[in-house]
């Protein structure tokens, strides 16, 4: 798809405001994830909703991380991560990893084991996607980490925790098949 130069000339010169953009993004419901890593750079984690599938050949997802985040260098140095998707009842863990607590305090909030990459996997996660980072692209204040999925642990039809309109919401899992 290519836009012609005449169409581009009619576009606004300035982007929308940061506030307007954030307000608009709050209207997009998203799964709540705790992103974790462990390796030579240390063990770290943060809460993220900016996670998205990219392709299934090879299985790849993306995670966005702010370059000013205290955990940024740790994730870049380790080059691996686990996307731990949270379920109903795990809002406190999301807040813990999204706050200003020490990494030790964050990890004390759950039971963990090491995945195939060495990244911490939350035993009670609805879904865990264990990944190696294959590419990083900088856009604005963030890096987009493209991650090849090496292992999946799925708790099945459990309830989901989502973030929408700046609030947590719980979605029921699928009803059992009759």
From Swiss-Prot:
The keyword Membrane does not apply. Gene3D superfamilies: Electron Transport, Fmn-binding Protein, Chain A. Keywords: Flavoprotein, FMN, NAD, Oxidoreductase. It catalyses: FMNH2 + NAD(+) = FMN + NADH + 2 H(+). GO terms for biological process: nitrogen utilization; uracil catabolic process. It comes from the Bacteria. Its EC number is 1.5.1.42. GO terms for molecular function: FMN binding; FMN reductase (NADH) activity; FMN reductase [NAD(P)H] activity; riboflavin reductase (NADPH) activity. SMART domains: Flavin_Reduct. Belongs to the non-flavoprotein flavin reductase family. RutF subfamily. NCBIfam families: RutF. Catalyzes the reduction of FMN to FMNH2 which is used to reduce pyrimidine by RutA via the Rut pathway. This is FMN reductase (NADH) RutF.
């Amino acid at each position: 798809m290519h836009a012609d130069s005449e169409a581009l000339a009619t576009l606004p010169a300035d982007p929308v405001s940061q506030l307007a953009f954030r307000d608009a993004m709050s209207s997009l419901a998203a799964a709540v994830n705790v992103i974790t890593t462990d390796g030579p750079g240390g063990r770290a984690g943060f809460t993220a909703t900016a996670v998205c599938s990219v392709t299934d050949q090879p299985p790849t997802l993306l995670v966005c991380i702010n370059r000013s985040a205290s955990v940024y260098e740790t994730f870049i140095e380790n080059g691996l991560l686990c996307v731990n998707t949270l379920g109903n009842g795990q809002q406190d863990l999301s807040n813990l990893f999204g706050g200003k607590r020490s990494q030790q305090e964050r990890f004390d909030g759950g039971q963990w084991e090491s995945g195939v990459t060495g990244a911490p996997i939350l035993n009670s996660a609805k879904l865990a996607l264990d990944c190696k980072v294959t590419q990083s692209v900088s856009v604005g204040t963030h890096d987009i980490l493209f991650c090849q999925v090496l292992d999946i642990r799925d708790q099945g039809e459990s309830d989901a925790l989502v973030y929408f309109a700046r609030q947590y919401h719980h979605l029921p899992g699928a009803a059992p098949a009759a």
